[in-house]
Amino acid sequence: MKKMSILSAAIFGLMMSAPVAFADDITVSVVGPMTGQLATIGDQFKQGAQAAADAINAAGGVNGSMIKLDIEDDQCDPKQAVSVANRIIANGVKFIDGHACSGSSIPASAVYAEAGALMMSPASSNPVLTDAAAKSGWPTIMRLYTRDDAQGAFIGPWIAKKYAGKNVVILHDKSAYGQGVADAVRATMNTGGLKEVYYDAINPGEKDYSALVTKLKDLKADVVYFGGYHPEAGLILRQSAEQNLKFQLIMPDSIASPEFWQVAGPAG
């Protein structure tokens, strides 16, 4: 219901303030990783958007117009995201529910801003998205998700306090999202008085992280904070268990997918 009211209000506001012509339906492009290893996130996007559209339409639509969804796949790839954004604008769509990954949202936002389209990202947390929009004077670029620096302000000090004296490792997957949130947590954890014993990036999509697991064993890691997504997190945890290594894994809510448990197995 919250998403329904935000979407409805945003569309209504842009309708009243901008010279946008509408037919019987209002098209909203829902953009995310509909295929690929992060497709579960895209599926969540689709289901959430459909529930919101159904509720809005059942209540009479927006100013009498019905919501129609256009599902687009960017696979969380920045280049594909820009291509998708250009296609959406070429098709005359003015309302975008997406993108998911910060690395996709940031470059795509420039395309939407130039066209005066409303972009609301439900999942992109890198501060650059809205900071760049504010600096450039793009009022139609928005996020519905907590920024990395806000997440770091909470998680970093908590780790510093709870795991004082422990061996903490911070990893990320090189993405705008993963590195952004990992760096935010690292900075506030350090300010809180705890220094990590190891900080590094992994290569996402790999099937064998045994070298990393060996490194974690050598470091006697007690805690691993991972800025990234569930496929790699589950695999690292499973392969660690196979080498009899146990540690406390801490992640943002990108871990919240049934696939994490499928990949991690009993180690999860």
Model-derived segments and their meaning:
Residues 102-113, 207, 214, 221-243:
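Hydrophobic alpha-helical
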Residues 1-8:
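Bacterial N-terminal signal peptides that target proteins for export
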Residues 18-23:
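Sec/Tat signal peptide C-region and signal peptidase I cleavage site
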Residues 63-73, 92, 193-201, 219-223, ...:
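A local structural motif
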